[in-house]
C-alpha cells in the first residue's frame, strides 16, 4: 500500500482548474441560432438539445481519454471503440434521448491496418448494443502532435420535447436507483496510471484478487452502455437521470440543486478497492473521481423504483433530500 495519499490533481488533472477553463471557453460561445435548430438549453448538461419541431435533436461529444494508453501497453485495442460509443450514448440517455447516429474521430501517429481493424471492431460492437448507425468519421495522421492515438466521437439522438429529462421534476423524497458499472469505465485513468506506475505492480501482472486475468485487461473492461434506460423511460415515471463519469458524484449538481442521500450504495468492484489501497487514495477523492460501482442513476417516485431496478439490474441506493451529497457518513464536496 502506498504511504502517499494520491489525488487526481497529483496525477495531472485538477478538476477545479478544468472547470474554470471550460467556463472561460463557454463564456466566449455567444452566437445562438434562431428558428429551426435553435438550442433549447444552455451549455453544460449531458447533451445539447436543438429545436426540431415536435422533437429535439440531442448532441454529445466525448472520447476515451488516457485509457487508450493502457490499450497501447497491452497491445489490445478491440474494446476502446465500445468505450467511445458508451461515453457518448450514456450522456444522451441521461437526458432521455434515443441514440440514432454516430461519427468518430481517430487521430494517429501512424497508420497500422491491424490496429485500425481492432478499433473498428469495438466501434461496431458499441453501435450494435446502442441500436444506432455509424454514418461517418475522420481519421487524421498527426505525427508531430499525437504519440500513439486518440479516439473520440459525436453522437446524435432524438427525443420528443415533452419527454426530455433534465431534472426539473426531481422532488424531495424521490428514490434513487443505482445501476451497476462494469468497473472503472473511461474516467479517472490519469490517476489510475499514476497509481500503477508508483505501485509494485505492472499492467501485465495478475490481479491480486483474481489470478485469471491481468491488471491491464481488468482496466480495459469496456464501459457499460445503459441502453435499457430507454425501457425504463417507457415503463416508469422518471424524474431525473445521471451518468456517473468525470468528477464522480460531483456531476450530480447538473441534475438538480437538491441533495442526494446514498444510504445504501452499490458495493464498489474489487478494482476500486485495489486502486484505493495501492494509491492510498482517500474515500472522498475516490467518490470525486470514479463511479465507485454506480455507473448510472435513475431518480423516480417510490412506486416505480422496483420496476426500474428490475429492468436495469440495479437497486434502490438512496433518496433525494433538501441539500448536499452524502454516501453513508461521507460528505461529497
Curated annotation (Swiss-Prot):
Top EC category: ligase
The GO cellular component terms are:
cytosol
Q: Name one GO molecular function term.
A: phosphoribosylamine-glycine ligase activity
- What is this enzyme's catalytic activity, as reactions? 2-formamido-N(1)-(5-O-phospho-beta-D-ribosyl)acetamidine + ATP = 5-amino-1-(5-phospho-beta-D-ribosyl)imidazole + ADP + phosphate + H(+)
EC number per UniProt: 6.3.3.1
- Give the pathway listed in the UniProt entry for this protein: Purine metabolism; IMP biosynthesis via de novo pathway; 5-amino-1-(5-phospho-D-ribosyl)imidazole from N(2)-formyl-N(1)-(5-phospho-D-ribosyl)glycinamide: step 2/2
Biological process terms in GO annotation: 'de novo' IMP biosynthetic process; adenine biosynthetic process
UniProt entry keywords in alphabetical sequence: ATP-binding, Cytoplasm, Ligase, Nucleotide-binding, Purine biosynthesis
Cystine connections? none
- SUPFAM superfamilies from the xrefs? PurM C-terminal domain-like, PurM N-terminal domain-like
The record's subcellular location field reads: Cytoplasm
Protein family according to the UniProt entry: Belongs to the AIR synthase family.
Spell out the protein name for this chain.
Answer: Phosphoribosylformylglycinamidine cyclo-ligase
